[in-house]
Each structure stands twice: as structure tokens, then as C-alpha cells.
Design a protein with these regions (language model features):
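Juxtamembrane regions of bacterial inner-membrane/periplasmic proteins
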Residues: 1-221
């Protein structure tokens, strides 16, 4: 009886391993299909492509300080940040907030639905790890900065920092001053919520926070 039980346990474990490998391969195919190709053309979307090295270093630094300070040290998922957020929620009564890395955000924005389910978060984490195994950090940052949603004007959406710069400031992203860079980074949290036309005070408060971080924190890049 023990031998039969042991045999079945081994079979079940092998089946689980096979299912996991198959699922990981499927996710890998989705990631490769999305990120090994050029940007697709989307109707009613303004998107200007820049290479990573064309973006101002101050802008990249602000982005990393606000969205993912451990970007160059993790492998797609920041487990330390997840534990820190959970600890703060459970023991310090802090608001439960997201702990998604830039890689996870890129996966979510490019491939996944907005559903806040456990299964989607698991998919997001696995695909972020696959993304980082497949591409270097500069590519991931470049892709994120070229595709992230920053504004809406009627039926037209503006994706990427370069198009956001043209929309909000009517200038090339390389010509932005620090406050304008901080404004674009601030808008990542919610272009509607921080809309400069409707909520200037709300936006200003967040911009000041980002400028303070940029001035006082150790540079990441």
C-alpha cells in the first residue's frame, strides 16, 4: 500500500511539474511574441519612440526613484518590497498598496487585463521574470518609457514620455526642465486623477515630492 501511495505521489508531482513547464512555455511564447516585435500601429494612439539613451538621465532617475528603486537589482519581481508592503499593512496599519516592479507594470500594460485577481498577479509575476530572462534592463526601461499611458484627449490616447512631453509642454522630451520631468512621472499614478487642468494642486503636491526625492535620494542612474 505504501509503495502504491508513493508511486502515485511521484506521478502527481511529475504531472504538476509538466503542467508548470508547459504553462511557463506558453507564457514565454506570449512574452517573446509581444516584445521581440516592433510596436504595432494603434488607431487613435499617439506614440513617439525613443531609444533609452535619448531619454534624459534625470527623467529616468525620477522614474526609478518613484516606481522601482530596486530595478537593477531584482529579476522581475521585488520580493523584499512585497514583504515590506505586507508587513506595513498587517502590523503598522498602513494602506495596502501595489508593489509591482516596472517589469510587472510593462507586462500588465502590454499583455494582461486589469482584473485584480490572484491568478492574474501570478501570471504577471511569472511573465515579468520571463521578460527579464529574455531581455536586458535597458530594453525593458525603453519599452516602458515608450508605451506607458500618460494622457487622453477626446478619443486620442498619448503613450510614452516623448508623446506626453509634446502633449503637455509642446516640446521635445530632451528639452524638458526638472519640474516638467517630475510632472510626467507624477502623471503615471493616474493621468485623470492628477490632470493638471482639473486638479493642479493635487498634481503640484506630487511633483514637489518627486523633486524632493530626486534632490535628496541617492541617484540610481
Amino acid at each position: 500500500m505504501k509503495l502504491i501511495t508513493s508511486s502515485w505521489i511521484k506521478r502527481i508531482l511529475l504531472l504538476c511539474i509538466f503542467i508548470f513547464i508547459s504553462y511557463a512555455w506558453y507564457l514565454n511564447s506570449l512574452v517573446k511574441a509581444e516584445f521581440s516585435s516592433d510596436f504595432g500601429s494603434m488607431e487613435d494612439v499617439i506614440q513617439v519612440q525613443y531609444s533609452f539613451d535619448e531619454y534624459p538621465k534625470d527623467l529616468v532617475n525620477m522614474l526609478l526613484l518613484v516606481e522601482d528603486q530596486s530595478f537593477f537589482n531584482h529579476s522581475g519581481v521585488d520580493f523584499k518590497e512585497i514583504l515590506r508592503v505586507l508587513y506595513g499593512y498587517l502590523f503598522d496599519e498602513k494602506e495596502l498598496r501595489g508593489a509591482s516592479t516596472i517589469s510587472q507594470q510593462l507586462i500588465k500594460n502590454s499583455l494582461l487585463s486589469r482584473d485584480k485577481t490572484l491568478s492574474r498577479k501570478v501570471e504577471e509575476a511569472l511573465m515579468a521574470i520571463i521578460l527579464e530572462l529574455s531581455y536586458d534592463k535597458k530594453f525593458i526601461l525603453e519599452r516602458y518609457m515608450n508605451t506607458v499611458y500618460l494622457a487622453q484627449q477626446g478619443s486620442t490616447a498619448f503613450h510614452g514620455f516623448a508623446s506626453g512631453s509634446l502633449h503637455y509642454f509642446e516640446k521635445d522630451v530632451s528639452s524638458l526642465n526638472l519640474r516638467e520631468m517630475a510632472t510626467l512621472v507624477a502623471l503615471l499614478k493616474g493621468p485623470s486623477y492628477f490632470n493638471p487642468a482639473n486638479f493642479p494642486d493635487r498634481l503640484k503636491k506630487r511633483v514637489e515630492m518627486i523633486l524632493s526625492m530626486h534632490k535628496n535620494y541617492k541617484r540610481i542612474i
